[in-house]
Structure formats: structure tokens, C-alpha cells
Amino acid sequence: MTTKDTWFTEHFQATGSAIGFRVTGKLDEVQSPFQKIEIYNSTDWGKLMVIDGALMLTSRDNFIYHEMISHPALFTHTAPKCVVIIGGGDCGTLREVLKHPDIEQVTQCDIDEQVTRMAEKHFPELCTSNNDPRATLLFSDGVAYMADCPTNSVDVIIVDSTDPIGPAKGLFNRTFYESCFRALKNDGLLIQQSESPLALLELIKEMRHEMSKAGFKAFKTLPFPQPCYPTGWWSVTLSSKQPNANFAFRQTDAQTKPFDTLYYNAHLHHGVLAPPPFIAHALGE
């Protein structure tokens, strides 16, 4: 990461590429017990949240990610009531989940309280549901939380984590997925951010392999644009306990949803279920 000549630049060694944003200065910085969190102001992308030198979100395009990690799973499940979010400290995913009026309970567990406090201060638009009576915000280890989660108690688990390094490394292995499998009801769904399908298909394949070893029977990786992330393309992976799951969604409910979105809609959901051939071939779909 550099800010030379008023640019924030992040280099991606794994993809041999970089991305930069013109900034006017650093607004805030905190070193938590887990990571360094920085906030920059940019000329064209609003504010930037950077964690340990990696860009987490911008004001301009975060809605794409937050909508795609939330609504596809919630409209695929037949009647979600209880949701767990692991990670998600910026609270944008929580906001999207609580747009669904039939959701009764959401527990968000992020290891680093400072991410949420920085989001409340600099991205208040993401935190509008933090005081919703249906929401419980916990600041502790998500791996430990899922290990202690009651059996057959959750409809949808959303793993909104950083990259599989540092504090998030434990969210990408069989042991964690076994905890998720046990906590989910029989018709429950797990959805997790799964990096760039353009550059990191091997990582996605390994994730799905670990999920399979934990007991999950069916998978669907959904790609979408995310301009501020490596390669400009990102994905989430949806997993089911049911072997014959085809991930059909409640299309009528998605079409008539009683809330606004900026990216997600029923037509887009239908299209994202048909991945590009190179993804389908690599993942055996």
C-alpha cells in the first residue's frame, strides 16, 4: 500500500496486479488488538476503509457486495427467520438482512469491535440497523461462536469475512464448516464470500472441498462485479445440506420485495445462477 502523489494503491501479488484510488488524505486510524484499520477520503469513491493495507470497502460500490452476500441466500431459503452473520463488522450485511420483514433474529459475531466503531463513525449509512431490536451484535471469535451454537437452530449463516489470512483464516476450513453444518436446520443455507473467480478459482475449489468434507452436499458460486477488489470481480458461494438442492429461489417474492436495492433484483438473481462456462467447467457445475 502506498499513498504517494495522493494515491492509495494496493498491490495484489497473487494476481500480478494493482488498483489505486486518488485520495485527499487519511481521516482516521486505529490499531486494534487484531489489525490496523484506516479510513481515507477519496476524490471519486467516497471514503475508503482499509484493514492491514487491504481495501475492504468504498462508499461508492460497497452496496454490490453487501446485497449479493445477503439477498440470494435469503430469497433461496423458503422462510428464513434466524440468521447468523460471522464477520460483517462494517454492518452493511446486517442492514441488508434486516430489510427482510420476516426475519426475526440476527446475530452478528465479529472478532474486532473497532471495525464496527469505525463504520459507525465514518460509514453511518451502513449501520442504520445496528439498533434494530432483532439484531444482536457480538464481538468475539466467530469460530468459537459457531462451535457453541445450538444444533439445528439457524436458517441462514452468512460468512462475511476478510481474506483467508490473519483473523479470518479459521473461517475457511473443515472444522468451522462442521460447526456451521451442525448449527443449520435441515433446510439451512451457508453463504460465504469466496474471493475472485477470475484469479482464485483454486481457492474456491478448496473451499467447496472443505465444505463437502464437513457434510454439505450442494454448492453454487455466484460471481458479480466488485470494482474495488482484486480483478474487479468477486463471488459468494452458497452451500446446502440437501443433496438435490438446485438453489431455485422465491422469484415472485424477489420481484415484489418490500424494500429497495441498488444492484440485486430477481432478474439478476436468475442470471447469476448460470455461471460463465470457465467457472462452471472449473467447478464441475
From Swiss-Prot:
Residues 5-241 form the PABS domain. Pathway: Amine and polyamine biosynthesis; spermidine biosynthesis; spermidine from putrescine: step 1/1. It catalyses: S-adenosyl 3-(methylsulfanyl)propylamine + putrescine = S-methyl-5'-thioadenosine + spermidine + H(+). One of its GO terms (biological process) is spermidine biosynthetic process. It is found in: Cytoplasm. GO terms for cellular component: cytosol. S-methyl-5'-thioadenosine binds at residues 35, 110, 141-142, 167. One of its GO terms (molecular function) is spermidine synthase activity. The active site is at 160 (proton acceptor). Spermidine binds at residues 66, 90, 160-163. InterPro entries: PABS (IPR030374), PABS_CS (IPR030373), SAM-dependent_MTases_sf (IPR029063), Spermi_synthase (IPR001045), Spermidine_synt_N (IPR035246), Spermidine_synt_N_sf (IPR037163). Keywords: Cytoplasm, Polyamine biosynthesis, Spermidine biosynthesis, Transferase. Its EC number is 2.5.1.16. HAMAP family: Spermidine_synth. Catalyzes the irreversible transfer of a propylamine group from the amino donor S-adenosylmethioninamine (decarboxy-AdoMet) to putrescine (1,4-diaminobutane) to yield spermidine. Belongs to the spermidine/spermine synthase family. Homodimer or homotetramer. This is Polyamine aminopropyltransferase. It comes from Xylella fastidiosa (strain M12). The lineage of its organism: Bacteria, Pseudomonadati, Pseudomonadota, Gammaproteobacteria, Lysobacterales.
